[in-house]
């Protein structure tokens, strides 16, 4: 399966039991900041933004004082899982980022999608990639 198919079929899909509820944007990005695949709506990010995200995975709490920035949008960092998941909130939406051995899985959402639904979609794919050694 291509990386784009993972984004299209496993991240940008209808959320179980909620037809027409789906993430607004998603991507799989290498630890080096290279985009493996992304939705058409995923924001163009700056290398410094990706560096900040990677630093927070290695030094949990790094982004808490300044917020998480992606594509110029600032998210307030909320409780995640140290070294594994970063979660952010902005207004009625937010972001979930799951770290795997080689990549970061991103999901961005707006209402009516809930934070829990975004977490489920992103973390399920991230866990699968980890099981595959990726």
From Swiss-Prot:
CDD domains: PROF. Keywords: Actin-binding, Allergen, Cytoplasm, Cytoskeleton, Disulfide bond, Phosphoprotein. It is found in: Cytoplasm, Cytoskeleton. One of its GO terms (cellular component) is cell cortex. The modification Phosphothreonine is found at residue 114. Disulfide bonds join 13-118. A motif (Involved in PIP2 interaction) lies at residues 84-100. Gene3D superfamilies: Dynein light chain 2a, cytoplasmic. This is Profilin-4. It comes from Olea europaea. The lineage of its organism: Eukaryota, Viridiplantae, Streptophyta, Embryophyta, Tracheophyta.
């Amino acid at each position: 399966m291509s990386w784009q198919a993972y984004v299209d079929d496993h991240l940008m899909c209808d959320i179980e039991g909620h037809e027409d509820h789906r993430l607004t944007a998603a991507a799989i990005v290498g630890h080096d900041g290279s985009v493996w695949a992304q939705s058409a709506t995923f924001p163009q990010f700056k290398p410094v933004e990706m560096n900040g995200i990677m630093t927070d995975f290695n030094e949990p709490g790094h982004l808490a004082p300044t917020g998480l920035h992606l594509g110029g949008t600032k998210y307030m960092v909320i409780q995640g899982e140290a070294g594994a998941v970063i979660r952010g909130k902005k207004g009625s939406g937010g972001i979930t980022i799951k770290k795997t051995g080689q990549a970061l899985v991103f999901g961005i959402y707006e209402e009516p999608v809930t934070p829990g639904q975004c977490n489920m979609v992103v973390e399920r794919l991230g866990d699968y990639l980890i099981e595959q050694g990726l």
